[in-house]
From Swiss-Prot:
Keywords: ATP-binding, Helicase, Hydrolase, Nucleotide-binding, Nucleus, Ribosome biogenesis, RNA-binding. It comes from Botryotinia fuckeliana (strain B05.10) (Noble rot fungus). The gene is drs1. ATP binds at residues 312-319. Residues 299-473 form the Helicase ATP-binding domain. Belongs to the DEAD box helicase family. DDX27/DRS1 subfamily. This is ATP-dependent RNA helicase drs1. One of its GO terms (biological process) is rRNA processing. The lineage of its organism: Eukaryota, Fungi, Dikarya, Ascomycota, Pezizomycotina. SMART domains: DEXDc, HELICc.
């Protein structure tokens, strides 16, 4: 009987075998830590198994296997395990407790890789507190009075929220008093509203057919340019449709139309997808009881190894849609030799950290190992993890290429699955070079999956990724928002764009007082707003690319834990982030495109919850607002307008103007602190170089696939994708023609300048008298007969008088 036992052991690591006993034995063999007692334990196990086989006692063994949590493939056993699993889920209710525990940011994986230096970041709150202490010492109490006023406003706003049945229903009263124009934004004052009564009446006549809803629903604003833009958009769509349709038909795999309706019922639960028990237990711990539409469509297709192009609205569970099939496939991998098989690429560090947390929790009942490789974390820690050959690598493109070129223990030849989250952003110009470098290095025989809320339909972009007849899975209509999202727009009349910060402060102090993300287009605007919020007594944190990774983590943790009510962020936080309990998103100004707008407002109203997005829009933002309103009306989503009294916004704007000097002083003090910190770091760096000169010089030089010039060009393209072309003209040496244009422009700005006319050029007019005076005074003698000198007498360098 001993030889038969050895044969069974030989087949433990194969993919096709399915004996539950072999899997349990394989797990048990990895558990013992004492090598000396292994032989004795194996012998005792062998003798015990032979005795049991002789006495034909197999049922107790099967019961033990079931208790350990791994089932066989027998139909009766499978049904029993599934019923027990269903019962466990029902005991937990809807899984709400687990879901609440899961939704927080998981920074454990990121904190392990933080650089262990003693660098101290400059804290704006400390600078503001320091200045307030100085003012109190000198007898200035104006700032303290302002804080009391703001705190009273916050308390009043919070009381209103408690009286309301839900967090955002108390605002409906303002919605009823909205302006009737299409843009939905009432005039800031009585004079402005009276001046635009005629245009409002025309707008109402043009929109009678569309305004069938109640008064709380706003319609897009008619504009002289809107009709032309709509016509051009329709023409472009008509021209592109036949060609693009032909490309898609040839590129994508044909859609399989279900013959029977019973097939859709099979994927209404995770148990019907033939997932393994460890994966089902991981889904239970996270709190996922039923698959979302994108998950029910994607998981069965991805388990077959097909390439996938998936799209769904924000907050619909796209991360789990590709993580679950990846984990299921990895459960049946050969485990004898550790091998990295999956790479998941994200455009931002925060999104990669969040995906790492989700995947780690879903795989908590498996032996699958993960590695987080993003910028801002320690290279040494990541290299040590990659040396162990983790099964899944979750990374940003830049750090992935860095390890690919400079980490000797990291190889990409064994990758079998590539996932691109937020694929439309990864395919843009800013990431194009890095993505091409990765795609040309990893094996071509792989499974590729692309996911995004605004998935590109251009086949030309998708061809670059190397997809092989991908299956297109678009659950919701493209460029749509969540159905539970209410979109608000506040219109800034021409001439009031400078009061934008006043409107924002009014909203944050009186309307939306907690769990708010405010998006800005530039880092300097977000940082300046952070100072203004601090001086106004509003608790806020910031999140943008100029912060270190440690600062980013602390900032988001403070917002998540409720220590700060406002998160002032750039588009760095607009994609994929799932922060628990975000009630409101405010756009300080409309973004560059409608796609970015969809990702911004997708930070709220996630997973079926309600939320509200408010956009402060001026005339330059009309294009994006028009696209958002048009898409919302097509979808049937609620779009409302909010009217803020001009006096309220003006009072807050005046407070901001009074803070101007103090803001500049804080920025100056912050800059000085940064210079001091930089100097201290340079001193430590020099000391380390002296102490460890031989080791530092012995390190191999890190390489990159681009030159510095190419990196700057790629960075510039990425900025233009988000904020448009900034600056317009190229910097460099000016030509004489450009210099003359600048001189002429400067003269025109200085005032009215006299210019020669036709008479002056002919020697008549004003110049005739001047020439006569010059002849009397002397100088160059005139020609014969008092006529003008002959042309040959002039030299090439002489100037015309």
């Amino acid at each position: 009987m001993a030889p038969k036992r050895n044969r069974d052991d030989d087949f433990v690591l194969t993919l096709s075998d399915n004996e539950g006993e072999d899997l349990t034995n394989a797990v048990e063999e990895e558990l013992p830590l004492d090598p000396s007692s292994n032989k004795k334990r194996k012998r005792s196990d062998d003798t015990a198994s032979t005795k049991k086989s002789k006495k034909s006692k197999k049922k107790p063994e099967e019961e033990d296997v079931e208790e350990e949590g791994i089932w066989g493939i027998k139909d009766a056993d499978d049904g029993a395990m599934d019923s027990d699993f269903e019962f466990a889920l029902e005991a937990d209710g809807t899984g709400g407790a687990d879901l609440e525990e899961f939704e927080g940011w998981g920074f454990d994986g990121a904190k392990k890789g933080l650089n262990g230096g003693d660098k101290k970041a400059v804290d704006i709150d400390e600078i503001i507190a320091r200045r307030r202490e100085k003012k109190k010492a000198s007898g200035k109490k104006g700032e303290a009075d302002d804080e009391v006023m703001v705190d009273q406003d916050d308390a009043a706003a919070s009381n209103e929220e408690q009286d309301a049945p839900e967090g955002i229903d108390f605002e409906d009263e303002d919605d009823e008093f909205m302006a009737e124009d299409g843009f939905g934004m009432g005039a800031g004052s009585a004079e402005e509203s009276g001046a635009e009564e005629d245009s409002d009446a025309e707008d109402d006549e043009e929109g009678e057919d569309d305004d069938s809803d109640n008064d709380s629903v706003a319609s897009p604003a008619p504009h002289p340019d809107d009709a032309a833009s709509e016509a051009s958009d329709e023409d472009e769509d008509m021209d592109d449709d036949p060609e693009e349709a032909a490309k898609r038909e040839a590129f994508f795999a044909p859609e399989e139309k279900p013959v029977k309706g019973a097939k859709q019922e099979l994927n209404t639960t995770f148990q019907s997808m033939s997932l393994s028990r460890p994966i089902l237990r991981g889904l239970a711990t996270v709190g996922f009881t039923q698959p979302t539409p994108i998950q029910s469509k994607t998981i069965p297709v991805a388990l077959l190894g097909k390439d996938v192009v998936g799209g769904a609205v924000t907050g619909s569970g796209k991360t789990a849609a590709f993580v679950v099939p990846v984990l299921e496939r990895l459960l049946y991998r050969p485990k004898k030799v550790p091998t990295s098989r999956v790479a998941i690429l994200m455009p931002t560090r925060e999104l990669a950290i969040q995906c790492h947390a989700v995947a780690t929790k879903l795989a908590s009942h498996t032996d699958i190992k993960f590695c987080l490789a993003v910028g801002g974390l320690s290279l040494k820690v990541q290299e040590a993890e990659l040396r162990l050959r983790p099964d899944v690598i979750i990374a940003t493109p830049g750090r992935f290429i860095d390890h690919m070129r400079n980490s000797p223990s990291f190889t990409v030849d064994t990758l079998e699955i590539l996932v691109l989250d937020e694929a439309d952003r990864m395919l843009e110009a800013g990431f194009a070079d890095e993505l091409n470098e990765i795609l040309t290095t990893i094996p071509k025989s792989r499974q590729t999956m692309l996911f995004s809320a605004t998935m590109s339909s251009s086949v030309d972009n998708l061809i670059r990724v190397g997809l092989n007849r991908p299956v297109r899975l678009l659950v919701d209509s493209q460029k749509s928002t969540a159905g539970t999202l209410v979109q608000e727009f506040i219109r800034l009349r021409p001439g009031r764009e400078g009061k934008r910060m006043g409107y924002l402060l009014y909203l944050c102090a009186n309307v939306y007082t907690d769990r708010v993300i405010v998006f800005f287009r530039q880092k300097k605007e977000a940082h300046r707003a952070r100072i203004i919020f601090g001086l106004s007594g509003l608790k806020a944190t910031e999140l943008h690319g100029s912060m270190s990774q440690e600062q980013r983590i602390k900032s988001v943790e403070a917002f998540r834990d409720g220590k700060a009510s406002f998160l002032l962020a750039t588009d760095l936080a607009s994609r994929g982030l799932d922060i628990k309990g975000v009630d409101t998103v405010i756009n300080y100004e409309a973004p560059q495109s409608h796609d970015i707008y969809l990702h911004r407002v997708g930070r709220t109203a996630r997973a079926g919850r309600s939320g509200r997005a408010c956009t402060i829009a001026a005339e330059p933002d009309r294009k994006v607002v028009k696209a958002a309103v048009k898409a919302s009306r097509t979808q049937g989503a609620k779009v409302v307008s909010r009217v803020i009294e001009a006096s309220e916004a003006d009072s807050w704007s005046e407070k901001v103007d009074e803070m101007a000097d103090e803001i500049e002083e804080i920025l100056k003090e912050e800059k000085e602190d940064k210079i001091l910190a930089q100097a201290e770091m340079e001193v430590r760096k020099g000391q380390n170089f002296i102490d460890h000169e031989a080791e530092i010089k012995g390190r191999p030089k890190r390489t990159w696939f681009e030159t510095e010039k190419e990196k700057l060009a790629a960075k510039k393209l990425g900025v233009e994708e988000l904020n448009g072309v900034v600056g317009g003209k190229k910097k460099g040496k000016l030509s004489n023609k450009d210099k003359k244009k600048l001189d002429d422009k400067g003269e025109r700005l200085e005032g009215r300048v006299w210019k020669k006319g036709r008479q002056e050029r002919d020697g008549k007019g004003v110049l005739a008298k001047e020439k006569g005076k010059k002849k009397v005074k002397g100088g160059k003698p005139p020609g014969p007969g008092g006529k003008k000198p002959m042309r040959p007498m002039r030299t090439g360098g002489a100037k015309r008088k």
